[in-house]
A protein has these predicted regions:
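Terminal accessory carbohydrate-recognition/targeting modules of carbohydrate-active enzymes
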Residues: 1-283, 606-621, 665-668, 684-781
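Active-site-proximal structural scaffolding
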Residues: 110, 188, 202, 212, ...
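Short, well-ordered alpha-helical packing segments
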Residues: 129-132, 150, 155-157, 176, ...
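Substrate-binding groove/exosite segments of carbohydrate-active enzymes
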Residues: 224-227, 267-405, 513, 525-536, ...
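The feature captures the catalytic groove of carbohydrate-active enzymes
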Residues: 232-238, 242-257, 317, 362-379, ...
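Active-site acid/base region of carbohydrate-active enzymes
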Residues: 280-301, 335-338, 351, 356, ...
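Non-catalytic carbohydrate-binding regions of carbohydrate-active enzymes
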Residues: 480-516, 546-717, 761-781
Length: 781
């Protein structure tokens, strides 16, 4: 395997240290291996006994560590302290006789689960023993090194996803310690009983050799393959104080014979160094910016592994630890701000690599078989242009254009065969927004039908996504010089845009609406997705003003924490996650979902920047509300307002801000925040032109921050810094500085992309190139 590396900076260390806390335990290698059990049972025990994930595949237990006396008796450990930061989890233990031990857990690239130990107060000698229990397999092979330092365990296919598909996993348990320390290993097969990480329940105490450690019993398979295989390594320790004992479980799932491109052991520092640094007068906003940067790497996955060939971001932990289309749009917006474009591009490329023959996408890219992968609507058009604007690449743009063109054809032909310009939703899961009035309005049993496609709803969200995709494909076609394709997508864009404007706008409710499929009558259901047309260039002044009225109405959407997924006056509304009286895991009938909130804030930012289409008063309202909501949105994602405890759960109570902790899924990458800060708070936007160049515009939101600065924003290989102070701000692009006031944009002209330096990886900083500053256009002054 290859490992990229660079020298980490002090700034990255400071950013990691600032996220330290005592109530968290998630660890990941940034490649697909992650230890983040939602409800850990054995968190107070040494090692990794609770399950881990390799991509979508769960496996466990891994291993635990015991302190054992020379005579084989286990020493009770009491965990007295736990300190977490993204790159490690440090636990302190004490024993009844006054010994104190410190364990440092980490998950390193290539699925290496490491437990390192130091101690003080040891009297005499003792042993540290790492051991694991695994389900036997007929073709499993066990190899022990003669020095007793490692056990290789091959061919075990116990890693499974939630749909019971499995892949083989190779495990190697090893020990690192002083060459003089006694080492021993043992593998024993036992009939099944409870599988707890308690030394006294393992088979090893009864085969212990006093003063030597584990007895090297010859492995015997027994009369059948049922039961548990126990693997153990013992290391002798002595001295009042000591260090240097390390146990490591290497779990391998990468394709055999294929060399994986892995980061170095400093991968967390390299990751933070690759993203802009943001500082501001709002401690919560500043902290959360880096917390989202952390979440992106926690959920990063890399191939090659089965169907996954490119780096990407998984939607979350546990069974969400795979690329999913619905959140893929978010990840492309967020990760485009890394110096390296690999993850942003890879997010789309993984779906294109596995595109179905009919042009549709798998909803999830599993490393295992692509069966029952579902389907989700997503805003691929905006995501493609967003990545290309920051990291232009002709080959990627062409690949995206061709693949998304096929997807668009499938979407419009299968979900709008009558060519009405509206896109059909066929069940309540494929929008990612189940259990809400939208679907009940056209199918009274939509909630009970599940994934069965009995619902027919012309969805605002799905139709807006189609409009944005047609617009993006039209723009790319023009840049590629494909006039025929440009003409075709222009017509499609007009057809879909007219349907949104003429059919989906409800003049009575003054809000966009879903449509029933037959007569295309409006359902009148008020939901957060009804504001998604603000992502487009379609709404006029009256429509934007009307939508602002709904968003600021305390009887509809103006809750303390923005934005309820369904209006407060919806007959099914519930703030506490109840649907039909029963608390659900993922209801959308009133809870605040960061996904929809980031959509609507993004729409407000875009309307604020429509200087050529909307009057200043309307734009100002959009900008002020966007800024206020970014602050409230971010503040919501801290446990009880505690600055040290940011989170990102799936959904929240709109009145109290209480997250769905009962669900157990924290650090859910199902929204965007980094992009809102950079494009909204700091006003950065980039628009490519047909000649291959681009215009960089700075237009920060009004009245949100007294002071803020972001630096190391990499735009087409150039370094950008933006600083705002009160109503003044300045931007510097590779030494070229311009100053202005909030409300007056700054622009830089960037030359064609082929003149920009190539960024090879996140650890390498490209040399600076100056952009040409220009005055903003007259209408922006």
């Amino acid at each position: 395997m290859r490992q990229t590396s660079s020298v980490p900076t002090d700034a990255a260390e400071d950013r990691l240290a600032a996220l330290a806390r005592g109530d968290k335990w998630y660890l990941a290698d940034g490649c697909g291996a992650i230890w983040a059990p939602p409800f850990p049972v054995w968190l107070r025990e040494p090692g990794f006994w609770d399950p881990a994930n390799f991509f979508e595949l769960a496996f466990g237990p891994l291993f635990c560590v015991a302190v054992v006396r020379a005579d084989g008796m286990g020493v009770p450990l009491v965990q007295t302290r736990r300190d977490w930061r993204p790159d490690r989890l440090v636990s302190t233990y004490t024993t009844p006789d006054g010994m104190e031990l410190t364990e440092t857990k980490a998950v390193l690239p290539a699925g290496r689960f490491r437990s390192s130990w130091t101690w003080t107060g040891l009297k005499g000698t003792a042993f540290l023993v790492a051991y694991s229990a695994q389900t036997p397999q007929p073709d499993a092979k066990y190899t022990r090194t003669p020095d007793g330092r490692s056990i290789q365990w091959e061919g075990v296919a116990t890693a499974r996803n939630e749909r019971s598909r499995s892949r083989g996993v190779e495990l190697r348990l090893s020990a690192q310690a002083s060459p003089d320390a006694p080492h021993a290993s043992s593998v024993q097969r036992c009939q099944s009983t409870t599988c707890h990480p308690e030394w006294r329940l393992s088979p090893f105490p009864e085969s212990w050799e006093p003063g030597v450690g584990l007895a090297p019993i010859e492995f015997m398979p027994g009369i059948d393959d049922r039961g548990l295989d126990w693997l153990g390594l013992s290391v002798g320790i002595e001295g009042e104080t000591g260090q240097g004992v390390c146990f490591e479980l290497d779990a391998t799932l990468h394709e055999p014979g294929i060399e994986a491109d892995l980061p170095s052991e400093q991968h967390w520092h390299e990751h933070f160094d690759s993203y802009p640094a943001f500082r501001c007068g709002d401690a919560f906003l500043e902290r959360y910016f880096d917390y989202r940067v952390y979440g992106l790497h926690l959920c990063e996955v890399r191939g090659p592994a089965g169907n996954l060939k490119h780096p990407a971001v998984a939607e979350g932990i546990e069974y969400f630890h795979s690329p999913i289309t619905y959140s893929g749009q978010c990840h492309m917006l967020e990760t485009r701000w890394s110096r390296s474009p690999r993850v942003a591009r890879g997010t789309l490329l993984n779906f294109l690599d596995n595109q179905k023959p009919d042009g549709s996408f798998h909803g999830r890219v599993y490393t295992s078989a692509l069966i029952n992968t579902d389907f989700y609507h997503a805003n691929w058009g905006d995501a493609l242009l967003a990545v290309d604007a920051i990291h232009p690449d002709a080959a990627f743009l062409r690949r995206g254009f061709d693949g998304l063109g096929r997807y668009f054809d499938w979407l419009t032909q299968s979900r709008d065969p009558e060519q009405t310009g509206t896109i059909e939703v066929t069940n309540h899961f494929e929008t990612g927004q189940e259990y809400m009035s939208r679907y009940q309005a056209v199918n009274a049993s939509a909630d009970a039908d599940g994934w069965v496609s009995r619902t027919r709803l012309k969805g605002v969200d799905a139709t807006v996504y189609a409009y944005q995709l047609a617009s993006a494909l039209n723009e790319v076609a023009l840049r590629l010089g494909d006039d025929a394709a440009a003409s075709r997508y222009t017509e499609a864009r007009k057809r879909i845009g007219s349907a949104i404007t003429d059919r989906m706008w409800d003049p009575d409710h003054k809000l966009y609406s879903d449509l029933e499929p037959n007569g295309l009558s409006r359902t009148g259901v008020k939901a957060a997705v009804c504001f998604y047309p603000m992502l487009t260039d379609l709404p006029d002044t009256a429509q934007v003003d009307a939508m602002l009225g709904h968003l600021q109405n305390p009887d509809e959407f103006a809750t303390p924490w923005p934005l309820p997924s369904s209006a407060l006056d919806d007959p099914y509304f519930s703030a506490d996650a109840r649907w039909q009286g029963k608390r659900h895991l993922c209801p959308w009938n009133g809870r605040v979902w960061p996904m929809t909130t980031s959509h609507v804030i993004e729409g407000l930012i875009r309307q604020y920047k429509r200087r050529d289409a909307l009057p200043d008063a309307t734009r100002q309202r959009c900008g002020e509300l966007a800024g206020q909501w970014i602050e409230r949105f971010v503040r919501m994602m801290f446990h009880h307002g505690d600055l040290a405890r940011p989170n990102c759960f799936e959904h929240y109570n709109p009145f109290t801000g209480q997250p769905c902790e009962y669900r157990g899924i924290d650090d859910y990458q199902h929204s965007w925040v980094v992009d809102l800060v950079i494009t909204g708070m700091m006003g950065v936007s980039v628009r490519a032109d047909r000649a291959g160049g681009a215009t960089l515009t700075l237009d920060p939101l009004p009245g949100v921050l007294p002071q803020a600065e972001i630096h190391s924003v990499w735009v087409r290989g150039r370094s950008l810094t933006v600083h705002r102070e009160g109503t003044a701000y300045w931007a510097e692009l590779d030494g070229q500085r311009q100053a202005s006031t909030i409300g007056q944009p700054i622009q830089f002209t960037l030359p064609p992309a082929d003149a920009a330096p190539v960024i090879l990886d996140a650890g390498r900083v490209p040399p600076p190139r100056a952009g040409k500053p220009t005055r903003p256009p007259a209408e922006a002054m």
